[in-house]
């Protein structure tokens, strides 16, 4: 019916001749109206179909309900018959208890469902929070991390720069502190020395003449002790060298062949030295032993064994080789104390420093009688080299060299 009415309306609207042209606004309105009418017709047709389907579904549901009721009744009848045959009769209290338990179970199930829904909602909220946090951190990773990284690097550079500056400043402060400490110590020491000198100068004004002379003599004695120690050290070194030379000479004496020992005394005196033949005197060891202890400290022994001049020349040259005169005096005293040792040393020197040219005629002499040698002693004076010691009186104290200084006073403390 409605469709027929709509078709009639369309026919009526389409009635005017086509030659009449409507304005653009009316044409647009007609076009929109036609679109709305077409959509309305489609919706009406769809609603009609849905109503028919709904009616069919209602009928089917009604039929299924009737069948369900019939089946339930049959089942109930069968159950009642089975229960009546061999089941226990259930009382009302049992039914009520069973219903209460069932209701309680259902309420528990409903509560569990509510709890599960609450947990699900909480989990969804937490998931949404984590998701939003994840999105935030992803955005931070993509955008903010670079900015923060640049900021962190700049801050680290600033921190390192500040540390370097602090270390440099601390080193500079340490250097300045050390310099100031050294300067203060140096100035304090200088001031202490200056004050001590002033104190000594002030003290020297009140020193009596006796104490002044004692101080000066003590300083002079210290200088003399230092010089004496130096001389003793030089003498020890010289003695050590002489001992080494003596050992070398003894070694040479024992290793060389002394052929001239076989030459008789008469031949040596007549041919080598050119002296007259002395009268023969028997060699007595007792006399020689008597002569040696009779010599005093001031009388050396002169030994005439082969060449007195060569022996004296060798011994004098040996003594003159030393620079120190005191050392020569000590050698003279040693010669006086041990004449027998001096005899052996002089003879050794003669044998070492002999001249072989004096024995040219030794080959043409022929066999001669071997004579024993004799030892003669002669008293000779000893001349000591006196060292003049400077004698200073009390009047010399006023000289500038004898001025008492702070170092001299400090040595007494």
UniProtKB/Swiss-Prot annotation:
Protein name in the entry: Coiled-coil domain-containing protein 83
Keyword Coiled coil found: yes
PANTHER family referenced in this protein's UniProt entry, alphabetically: COILED-COIL DOMAIN-CONTAINING PROTEIN 83, HSD9
Coiled coil spans: 32-186, 215-255
Lineage, top ranks: Eukaryota, Metazoa, Chordata, Craniata, Vertebrata
Domain of life: Eukaryota
Record InterPro entries: CCDC83
Keywords, sorted A to Z: Coiled coil
Chain's gene name: CCDC83
């Amino acid at each position: 019916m409605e469709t027929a009415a709509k078709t009639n309306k369309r026919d009526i609207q389409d009635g005017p001749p086509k030659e009449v042209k409507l304005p653009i606004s009316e044409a647009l309105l007609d076009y929109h109206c036609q679109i709305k009418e077409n959509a309305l017709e489609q919706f009406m047709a769809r609603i009609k179909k849905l109503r028919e389907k709904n009616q069919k579904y209602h009928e089917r549901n009604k039929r299924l309900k009737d069948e369900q009721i019939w089946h339930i009744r049959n089942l109930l009848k069968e159950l009642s018959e089975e229960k009546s045959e061999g089941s226990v009769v259930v009382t009302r209290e049992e039914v009520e208890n069973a219903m209460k338990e069932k209701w309680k179970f259902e309420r528990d199930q409903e509560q569990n469902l509510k709890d599960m829904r609450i947990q699900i909602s909480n989990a969804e909220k937490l998931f949404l929070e984590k998701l939003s946090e994840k999105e935030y951190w992803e955005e931070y990773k993509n955008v903010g991390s670079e900015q923060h990284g640049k900021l962190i690097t700049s801050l680290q550079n600033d921190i390192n720069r500040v540390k370097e500056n602090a270390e440099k400043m601390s080193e500079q402060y340490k250097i300045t502190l050390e310099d100031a400490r050294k300067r203060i110590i140096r100035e304090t020491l200088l001031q202490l020395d200056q004050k001590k000198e002033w104190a000594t100068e002030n003290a020297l004004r009140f020193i009596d003449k006796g104490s002044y002379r004692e101080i000066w003599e003590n300083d002079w004695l210290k200088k003399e002790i230092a010089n004496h120690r130096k001389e003793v050290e030089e003498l020890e070194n010289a003695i050590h060298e002489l001992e080494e030379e003596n050992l070398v000479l003894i070694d040479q004496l024992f290793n060389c062949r002394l052929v001239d020992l076989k030459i008789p005394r008469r031949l040596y005196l007549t041919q080598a030295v050119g002296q007259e033949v002395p009268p023969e005197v028997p060699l007595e060891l007792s006399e020689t032993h008597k002569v040696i202890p009779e010599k005093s400290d001031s009388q050396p022994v002169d030994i005439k064994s082969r060449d007195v001049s060569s022996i004296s020349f060798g011994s004098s040259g040996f003594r003159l080789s030393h620079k120190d005169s005191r050392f020569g005096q000590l050698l003279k005293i040693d010669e006086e104390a041990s004449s027998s040792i001096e005899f052996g040393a002089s003879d050794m020197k003669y044998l070492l420093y002999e001249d072989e040219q004096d024995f040219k005629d030794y080959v043409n002499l022929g066999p001669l009688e071997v004579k024993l040698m004799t030892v003669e002693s002669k008293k000779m004076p000893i001349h000591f080299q006196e060292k003049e010691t400077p004698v200073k009186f009390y009047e010399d104290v006023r000289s500038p060299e004898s001025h008492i200084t702070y170092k001299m006073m400090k040595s007494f403390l």
